[in-house]
Each structure stands twice: as structure tokens, then as C-alpha cells.
């Protein structure tokens, strides 16, 4: 790939993925924020054993650079365990909306707000590869179509199981629901504690970051936004 060239098509609508040759499964993302790059497709096509071996070798090198002995008893299995853990923490790269939704969209004559709050999420900051942990609150106002409630949590999990920044994660969840249901609007609020602010840097335990992403009527109507924030018990 040429330096600076994107692996996705950043069209005006930003809804068209770049074609990936040899793709065995569609990987769906939104808004050009996390389109699968060539490395993502390689991950999907590479055998699990090979991925674990490559990551394990890299971790052994890191341990040596830290002044440790990867061959000592306490660390003998650490590189392989870490490799398997990282593949699990980032399994969202191998998931897509079609599989996550699994046709759980239903016709329903309901046009009032639907909210699922306090969804626990765990992700990895893409800047330091350390965790951020928090909760997501999701609301939407249907337009004759509703989504199975568990699917809202599964969408949040799919995007959180990638290397992320909180702002992008919040926006991706909102845009995914908007794309799937085409409702009157979607509201997503996320609160999280970032270990990169707790364990290093400013070292401020107890601090939290709040982000939001609003579409449709939640953007246009102050009253609707206010109702959502009141119902999730925030602000």
C-alpha cells in the first residue's frame, strides 16, 4: 500500500467499503472510521496457530528488552497466554454487523424511546494498548422496526473488542444502529476509566471520560435529548 493511502473508500456518504481480494467474510464498519485494512484481512485468513506463534515470539522479545528472562519458570507460558488473550481482546476485527444482528430486526408498531443502559464494555486504547473500562447507554426511537435487545450489547461488544479511542467507539455504535434500523434517531453515551490516565501520564485514579454520539431527532430536539439523559440518569 502506498504511504498515506487509505484502505477504505472515503466517499461523501462514507458507507462503501474498499474491496478486499480473497475476502472470506464481509467485515462491516461505518463512516470510514474503522474499515478493515489489509492487516485485518490477513488476520481472518491466517491460521490461529500461526498468529499465536508470531505474537508469542514478539512478546518474548519484549520481555527480554524489559530485562526479564522469558525462560524462567514464571514466564515460560506467558508469551503464548498473552498472544491468546490479545486475540480474544481484539476478536471484534473478525466480526461484522450481519453476523452480530443475525436477522434479529422485527417489525413493530412502536415509536417511543427504547433504552438499554449500563452495558459493560472493555476495550484497549490504541495509543498505549492498555485497557479502558466503562459502560455504554444506548437509546433509539424506532420507525416501525426494532432490534433484539441483546443485539445492542453485542454491537457495543463488537466495536469495543478492537483497538479503539472512546470517541470513535461511541460514534461507531450509534452509526451501526442507525444503519441497521434507520430509526428516527439514536443516542449513545459512554463513560469510561482509562488506565493510560490512571497507571501512567497524569496518574489520576477516579477520573472518567464521558462521550456521546447523537443522530436524527436526538440531534434536532433538545426535549428528546433531555428525556434520554434523564432516563439514563445522567446530567
Curated annotation (Swiss-Prot):
InterPro entries: GTP-CH-I_C/QueF, GTP-CH-I_N, GTP_CycHdrlase_I, GTP_CycHdrlase_I_CS, GTP_CycHdrlase_I_dom. GO terms for molecular function: GTP binding; GTP cyclohydrolase I activity; zinc ion binding. SUPFAM superfamilies: Tetrahydrobiopterin biosynthesis enzymes-like. It catalyses: GTP + H2O = 7,8-dihydroneopterin 3'-triphosphate + formate + H(+). GO terms for cellular component: cytoplasm; cytosol; nucleus. Residues 18-27 have a biased composition (Polar residues). The keyword Hydrolase applies. PROSITE patterns: GTP_CYCLOHYDROL_1_1 (PS00859), GTP_CYCLOHYDROL_1_2 (PS00860). Keywords: Allosteric enzyme, Folate biosynthesis, GTP-binding, Hydrolase, Metal-binding, Nucleotide-binding, Phosphoprotein, Zinc. Residues 1-27 are annotated as: Disordered. It comes from the Eukaryota. CDD domains: GTP_cyclohydro1 (cd00642). The keyword Cell division does not apply. One of its GO terms (biological process) is tetrahydrofolate biosynthetic process. The modification Phosphothreonine is found at residue 25. Zn(2+) binds at residues 125, 128, 196. Its EC number is 3.5.4.16. GTP shows a positive allosteric effect, and tetrahydrobiopterin inhibits the enzyme activity. Belongs to the GTP cyclohydrolase I family. Toroid-shaped homodecamer, composed of two pentamers of five dimers. GTP cyclohydrolase 1 is the first enzyme in the biosynthetic pathway leading to folic acid. This is GTP cyclohydrolase 1. The lineage of its organism: Eukaryota, Fungi, Dikarya, Ascomycota, Taphrinomycotina.
